Regions:
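PAS-family sensory domain signal
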Residues: 22-73, 116
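PAS-family sensory domains
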Residues: 4, 8-11, 61-133
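Intrinsic disorder/low-complexity signal
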Residues: 16, 35, 39, 76-79, ...
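PAS-family sensory modules
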Residues: 1-38, 132-141
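A sequence-level detector of short linear motifs
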Residues: 49-50, 114, 132, 139
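Hydrophobic pocket-lining residues within nucleotide cofactor-binding pockets
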Residues: 43, 122, 140
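Short N-terminal helix-initiation segments at or just after the protein's N-terminus
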Residues: 13-20, 45-51, 76-83
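A short acidic/small-residue loop/turn micro-motif
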Residues: 56, 120-121, 138
Length: 141
């Protein structure tokens, strides 16, 4: 490999790094200035990160709600939960392109809150098995 090729490769890598840094800044701005909560689910370990805004939507602090699906499932309306689990399963199986469900939750203070949950599998293994799914929670007024 010549020195010119190394210089061109270095310039390309620097541009890619600059673009990634810019995209990260945009994403951080959006997440900071939106009222939506978000979640990130590692399907292999069943760890589901629940953002502080998502927990706040439901009336909880960061420490009051564990990062696992059971945390939100336990306060979701049972019929909505059944419908939602079916939609998640359909999406994980590749039947649907993405996942959407409207759910009623019992807020920590006791009132009902309606939330639109949207998500998508963003990582699959070599056998097309889902590994990671991410999504958002939007309060419906």
């Amino acid at each position: 490999m010549s020195i010119d090729n190394i210089k061109k490769l270095t310039e390309t890598l620097n541009r890619v790094e600059d673009n990634l840094h810019e995209e990260k800044g945009i994403l951080e701005f959006i997440l900071e200035h939106t009222t939506d909560g978000y979640w990130d689910w590692d399907l292999t370990s069943n760890y589901q990160y629940l953002s502080p805004k998502l927990k706040k939507q439901l009336g909880y602090t960061e420490d009051e709600m564990e990062n696992k699906p059971e945390s939100w499932q336990s306060i979701c309306d049972k019929l909505d939960l059944e419908k939602t689990e079916k939609r998640i399963e359909d999406h994980l199986d590749g039947i649907t392109e993405d996942f959407k469900s409207v759910m009623n939750f019992t807020h920590k203070d006791g009132h009902i809150i309606k939330i639109l949950c949207r998500g998508k599998v963003v990582k699959r293994d070599e056998n097309n098995q889902p590994l990671r799914m991410i999504g958002t929670h939007t309060i419906i007024l």
